[in-house]
């Protein structure tokens, strides 16, 4: 019994830093030093990629939810390889007709490894007031006067 409690505590420690980000129209839960298969990216192996669309970020102390994205948060990925997923068979048949069609599809994937999850410090807003610009009052142009 005590071992199971320790293992549950260890699993919580593994999730001290994670981020949920959007890439290729899908949302992924990213953790540092883990591999993920995402839709094919136009990048070569060993290239570095940065994701800016971070929806949620959790570190040791807090959870930050973006509106819609977390400001100044980035995830750095490294492309490990390009591969193809297993084949998915699609079978179409029209009843009472002699029409049958069997097709297959293999999704193109890119395997990436998360190198780091970074949160930039927000820039402090200056307390100086904006200078108000005063428009000069211009007289409306009158129509040509006839003499």
Curated annotation (Swiss-Prot):
It comes from the Bacteria. One of its GO terms (molecular function) is rRNA binding. Disulfide bonds: none annotated. One of its GO terms (biological process) is translation. Residues 128-147 have a biased composition (Basic and acidic residues). This protein binds to 23S rRNA in the presence of protein L20. NCBIfam families: L21 (TIGR00061). HAMAP family: Ribosomal_bL21. This is Large ribosomal subunit protein bL21. The lineage of its organism: Bacteria, Bacillati, Cyanobacteriota, Cyanophyceae, Synechococcales.
């Amino acid at each position: 019994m005590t071992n199971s409690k320790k293992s549950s505590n260890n699993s919580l420690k593994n999730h001290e830093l994670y981020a949920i980000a959007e890439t290729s129209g899908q949302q992924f839960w990213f953790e540092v030093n883990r591999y993920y298969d995402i839709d094919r990216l136009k990048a070569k192996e060993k290239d570095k990629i940065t994701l800016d669309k971070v929806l949620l970020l959790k570190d040791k102390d807090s959870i930050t939810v973006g509106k819609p994205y977390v400001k100044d948060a980035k995830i750095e990925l490294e492309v490990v390889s390009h591969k193809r997923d297993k084949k998915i068979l699609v079978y179409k048949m029209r009843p009472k007709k002699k029409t049958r069609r069997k097709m297959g599809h293999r999704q193109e994937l890119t395997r990436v490894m998360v190198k780091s999850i970074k949160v930039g410090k927000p820039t402090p807003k200056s307390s100086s007031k904006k200078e108000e610009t005063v428009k000069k009052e211009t007289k409306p142009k009158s129509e040509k006067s006839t003499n």
